[in-house]
Amino acid sequence: MDHAGDAMRTDLMTITRYVLNEQSKRPESRGDFTILLSHIVLGCKFVCSAVNKAGLAKLIGLAGETNIQGEEQKKLDVLSNEVFVKALTSSGRTCILVSEEDEEATFIEPSLRGKYCVVFDPLDGSFNIDCGVSIGTIFGIYMVKDFETATLEDVLQPGKNMVAAGYCMYGSSCTLVLSTGSGVNGFTLDPSLGEYILTHPDIKIPNKGKIYSVNEGNAKNWDGPTTKYVEKCKFPTDGSSPKSLRYIESMVANVHRTLLYGGIFLYPGDKKSPNGKLRVLYEVFPMSFLMEQAGGQAFTGKQRALDLIPTKIHERSPVFLGSYDDVEDIKALYAAQEKTA
């Protein structure tokens, strides 16, 4: 009998064990972050279960309401938002919540407050629920100096001030990708155990990739640098092979593929939407944080994405993120345009 093999299967690094290990490296830690993360993990498990049962439980379809973005809300959108608001509030470790689904920030009542602000998109890509495409939850976490007097200014910070970010993808498996500021790790939900197990330790994005990811349906409205970059991807003049286009209307799915395989994800501004469509706080910042922690880059067309200082909780920004060298290429095109302007 292969006892060594059995031992390998039983020595599982769960996400809770991983975070506790990280906590032990910081003597000043009191366990607040671990408790907060456990509530986020619980929310992800609940939403994963709801997504898997959506068709049977009649959660597919519209809820008959629109969110602050003017988008029709799916039933799962509404449910997912309620799940995360309740999970984060009951943790006793948050003071402000910003959700894609809510017009205003949620200020936690004083008796339940903690030192963290959480920004999140409870169900990114929900447009694809009905057809079974991978969708996900995106989140970012800030820490405040004084939670008793916390204001909106404590949330409107540059992304570089985040203490953690991640996403949970609900697809063929349920995968949670997390960074606490010291690299990126991926955990997969084992349904038989009900635990997220470390399956992708220390994720590093390749320096250059063979894939680009963009909605080419908007090409006629793109600016010069984006148009030139995509042309270069399809028709390289340096003798290299063309890049392959891979795109689906789910940021989590696109970014997850880019993170693992390399390449670049582009959501530029255009003539119709000069500021792009992705929200800074709970889409651009968390994904940019993860990309940088994995060795990649994130750029807005003007500056490093994580240096942006938002002025509104639902502010939008263009973003180009992915492999370091691929993002360098599009940065060079924007720099060249600046020189000729």
UniProtKB/Swiss-Prot annotation:
Subcellular location field: Cytoplasm
Cofactor: how and how many bound: Binds 3 Mg(2+) ions per subunit.
Protein EC: 3.1.3.11
Protein keywords: Carbohydrate metabolism, Cytoplasm, Hydrolase, Magnesium, Metal-binding
Residues that coordinate or bind Mg(2+) 1: E71, E100
A Pfam entry, by short name: FBPase_C
PROSITE patterns: FBPASE (PS00124)
Signal peptide: none
Needed co-factor(s): Mg(2+)
Protein residues bound to Mg(2+) 2: E100, D121, L123
Residue numbers binding substrate: D124, G125, S126, F127, N215, Y247, Y267, K277
Catalytic activity as recorded in UniProt: beta-D-fructose 1,6-bisphosphate + H2O = beta-D-fructose 6-phosphate + phosphate
Cellular component GO terms, alphabetical: cytosol
Principal location listed in the UniProt entry: cytoplasm
GO biological process: fructose 1,6-bisphosphate metabolic process; fructose 6-phosphate metabolic process; fructose metabolic process; gluconeogenesis; sucrose biosynthetic process
Similarity section: Belongs to the FBPase class 1 family.
Protein name: Fructose-1,6-bisphosphatase, cytosolic
Species for this entry: Pisum sativum
